[in-house]
């Protein structure tokens, strides 16, 4: 998530604009009762937009999440990256009355921030402010989203930043993220999900300021927005916000549907040949018809968490590949598309997809251990898919996982984000309550049935970032054993198991493994 923290403008405190001096919020009309800790929804009408509010008078902050049902899947062909760039231009070009520099100076004294996130199907603007500063902050936030400046100078600046994010950051310096995006590109070949939200080189080069303005009018519109607010806001404020955001234009057309991902049989491997890579990054996955709306999803979430809960030592993959063998920093698996929220270990809310995938993430390993790490991950995944999780383990891990969910919702903003996700998926029971209830009834038989229905496919896609793709392809296709290269001796129980892992069958043929030069990846 991009976040605009305006600490760089400390020297400008003396020149804070008069626009900071806002009168108290005028809240017209009847108020809405807000039971503590509960979500209140105001439906869309001619005079307002859809709104979800969570009032908490004991909070010291007010959190905003302005969620649009639009993402990179609606980038026009040849303009890949347009939605994300339009989002940045909305948040970071200033307002009709303020330049970006003036806006930054106005926000600094409030220690306020505005963040954005664009994924395949959703874009969210996030903001947090001290409750005491709500009137003047909201006046700015409203103008940022409703009347952005969209000027030439900001377009040049943000367009160049997007190009740098693609070439220098994603492709140049972040092989972990690159591997995940390469996996999406392989799973969703010739599909609207097939390019990263930041775009492609050709797409970014072709985008004009007029394209940004047209995309904003086309998809950042009234019928696609839900405004979320949480915290210590005054009575009636939610109604005012819903009415203010009705100034967004009407949506000119319905949202287009999505095609099904292409199908293949067995394992399909894409190796991105990156000569400068000093390690090997691996991502594995497959598309699924499951989303959070599915009855099986809580069980699938339990299983993937047991095998590889994100950044937790409780997972099988973490224990066997990192703890026992020291191959990397961690190994995880997910029942839906996952992104980490900043530097935390928690999931980023408001990245819901209409089509989902199950994935395994093997953090970068030494090149000498790339094939072994891949085989190890496949072995443990297959083992638990085939043999299941014992009842005693379900009870033990279920207790931990149920309590862990509370940590996911520690702030007003994150609780609001989860509530918006519940609304997106049309869930009547809040996320935590739903999964805890499902897990309390889970046993080995029920879990095995869910795994068999939803996770037992042999048709998986593997994306690898490697420095010598040709050599790695030859090794994988040959079927030759790939023993690990350790820096220190390992216990006999580990080395005995290594004999199994290093020979884990992949069944790959030459045509199953494709090499993509790094220069060609996301070029167009």
Locate predicted features.
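Histidine-acidic residue clusters that define the catalytic metal-binding segment
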Residues: 23-43, 166, 184-225, 252, ...
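An aromatic/glycine/proline-enriched structural segment found at the starts
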Residues: 23-32, 189, 226-290, 466-519
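Acidic/histidine-enriched segments that form metal/cofactor-coordinating
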Residues: 20-27, 103-215, 260-262, 375-379, ...
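C-terminal motif of bacterial Sec signal peptides marking the signal peptidase cleavage site
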Residues: 16-18
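Extracytoplasmic
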Residues: 35-37, 46-48, 58-65, 77-82, ...
